[in-house]
């Protein structure tokens, strides 16, 4: 029963041009996104099975990649098709598509950026189902929040791979 249950709950994800079961997708431990947080990401909401503001997210993705000098290995149209296909394959009516592009996986860990002509970026997309958000009390009434100062740059004493 455990194997059947696990199989039924498995999502389809996208990794470097191919679709995989989430349990089958593999990323190198030398990927700079993993070792150095050298990556960009976008999250596109899905409502009624449709992507919300895909163009805005794609434009920001391209700007972010340009700013970090990471080559974009996938065209706007191809990326849109991947988003739509993941929504379809995973039967997402309400949820999100998470996208991350890293500088890739050179053969060794190094602080020097790898030559973009020698190292391909890693492209990962997956979905998350978030049913009920649009009709939730929070969506209708809003949320109470508390804001705090962002102290990440003030904590350079912590050797974290994240910002």
Name what the model sees in each region.
Residues 75-84, 94-110:
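Short, glycine/charge-rich beta-strand/loop segments that flank catalytic centers
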Residues 71-73, 89-100, 134-135:
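Short secondary-structure capping/junction motifs at helix and strand boundaries
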Residues 91, 110-116:
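Hydrophobic alpha-helical hairpins/lids featuring a short glycine-rich hinge
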Residues 1-73, 77-85, 114-163:
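Helix-start/capping segments and mature chain N-termini
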């Amino acid at each position: 029963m455990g194997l059947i249950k696990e199989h039924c709950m498995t999502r389809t994800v996208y990794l470097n041009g191919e679709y995989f079961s989430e349990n089958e997708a593999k990323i190198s431990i030398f990927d700079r996104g993993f070792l150095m947080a050298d990556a960009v990401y976008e999250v596109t909401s899905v409502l009624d099975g449709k992507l919300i503001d895909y163009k805005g997210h794609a434009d920001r993705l391209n700007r972010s990649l340009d700013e970090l000098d990471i080559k974009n290995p996938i065209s706007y149209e191809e990326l849109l098709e991947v988003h739509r296909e993941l929504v379809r394959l995973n039967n997402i009516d309400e949820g999100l598509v998470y996208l991350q592009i890293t500088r890739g996986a050179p053969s060794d860990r190094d602080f020097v950026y790898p030559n973009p002509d020698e190292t391909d970026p890693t492209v990962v997309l997956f979905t998350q189902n978030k049913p009920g958000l649009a009709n939730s009390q929070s969506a209708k009434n809003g949320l109470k929040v508390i804001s705090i100062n962002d102290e990440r740059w003030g904590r350079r004493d912590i050797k974290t791979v994240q910002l």
